[in-house]
Amino acid sequence: MGNMQERPSETIDRERKRLVETLQADSGLLLDALVARGVLTGPEYEALDALPDAERRVRRLLLLVQSKGEAACQELLRCAQQTVSMPDPAWDWQHVGPGYRDRSYDPPCPGHWTPEAPSSGTTCPGLPRASEEEEIGGPEDSEAVQPRTPEEPELEAEATKGDEPDLEQEMEPEPEPEVEPEPEPEPEPEPEPEPEPEPEPEPEREPDFQEGDESEGCENT
């Protein structure tokens, strides 16, 4: 386990070889994490990310972070620990003691390389300056970038004015189609009452022929 009183910059010095070997595969993710934490600026990130050699990229990154102070070194070690997919528990740099977490960036560590001033246009050592890139480009690049005439802003302003009504028309929401009310269901017709059955007529009584015969017999007698 590492020394709890050891500074993060001293830990980087002691474990520099292992850091360079281990962080090469995930150097891009490490750069992203350092930019998100504010350790690296945008130009520094672009300059380091443009280096094709991963080993050289990590070496430059360690030097650049050490020049920013102990707080930046502590952030680098923390990001490296989170970035490495399979950390080795025997590595001492993963057990750096707390003490620099909430501090602002300190002045450069003594005995380490200090980056040049921002006015020089160089973000990392060994990278070409902006003036050198312009010289390399030659007169062809300078001719390609022509100064803008004062008439161009007026044309652009007119074009933007002409586009404003179109933008307003596009921003207006389209009216929603009216939803037709659903027709109410028609009431079901009530069933007609069944007609009452008519009473059957009573059968007529047949005349009693026997009584007539008897009366006729009596008269004959």
Swiss-Prot record:
Result after altering L31F: Failed to protect against extrinsic and intrinsic apoptotic pathways. Not interferes with death-inducing signaling complex (DISC) assembly. Promotes BAX activation
InterPro entries: Apoptosis_Repressor_CARD (IPR052685), CARD (IPR001315), DEATH-like_dom_sf (IPR011029)
Keywords attached to this entry: Calcium, Cytoplasm, Lipoprotein, Membrane, Metal-binding, Mitochondrion, mRNA processing, Myristate, Phosphoprotein, Sarcoplasmic reticulum, Ubl conjugation
SMART domains: CARD (SM00114)
One GO CC annotation: sarcoplasm
Domain of life of the native organism: Eukaryota
PTM text: Phosphorylation at Thr-149 is required for its antiapoptotic effect by blocking death-inducing signaling complex (DISC) activity through the control of interaction with CASP8. Phosphorylation at Thr-149 results in translocation to mitochondria and this translocation enables the binding to CASP8. Dephosphorylated at Thr-149 by calcineurin; doesn't inhibit the association between FADD and CASP8 and the consequent apoptosis.
Induction summary: Increased by chronic hypoxia. Activated by FOXO3. Negatively regulated by TP53.
Bias type Acidic residues, positions: 132-143, 165-201, 209-221
Molecular-function GO term, any one: phosphatase binding
Pfam families in UniProt: CARD (PF00619)
Renumbered residue ranges of the record's region Essential for interaction with BAX: 20-70
The keyword Mitochondrion is annotated on this UniProt entry: yes
Result after altering G69R: Failed to protect against extrinsic and intrinsic apoptotic pathways. Not interferes with DISC assembly. Promotes BAX activation
Entry keyword DNA repair: no
GO BP terms, alphabetized: blood vessel remodeling; cardiac muscle cell apoptotic process; cellular response to hydrogen peroxide; cellular response to hypoxia; intrinsic apoptotic signaling pathway; mRNA splice site recognition; myoblast differentiation; negative regulation of apoptotic process
Main location: cytoplasm
UniProt subcellular location: Cytoplasm; Mitochondrion; Sarcoplasmic reticulum; Membrane
Membrane topology: Lipid-anchor
Subunit (UniProt): Oligomerizes (via CARD doamin). Interacts (via CARD domain) with CASP2; inhibits CASP2 activity in a phosphorylation-dependent manner. Interacts with CASP8; decreases CASP8 activity in a mitochondria localization- and phosphorylation-dependent manner and this interaction is dissociated by calcium. Interacts with TFPT; translocates NOL3 into the nucleus and negatively regulated TFPT-induced cell death.
PANTHER family listed in its UniProt record: CARD6/NUCLEOLAR PROTEIN 3, NUCLEOLAR PROTEIN 3
Domain comment, as recorded: CARD is critical for both extrinsic and intrinsic apoptotic pathways. CARD domain mediates a protective effect against myocardial ischemia/reperfusion, oxidative stress and TNF-induced necrosis. The C-terminal domain (amino acids 99 to 221) is involved in calcium binding and plays a protective role in calcium-mediated cell death.
Name assigned to this protein: Nucleolar protein 3
Organism field: Rattus norvegicus (Rat)
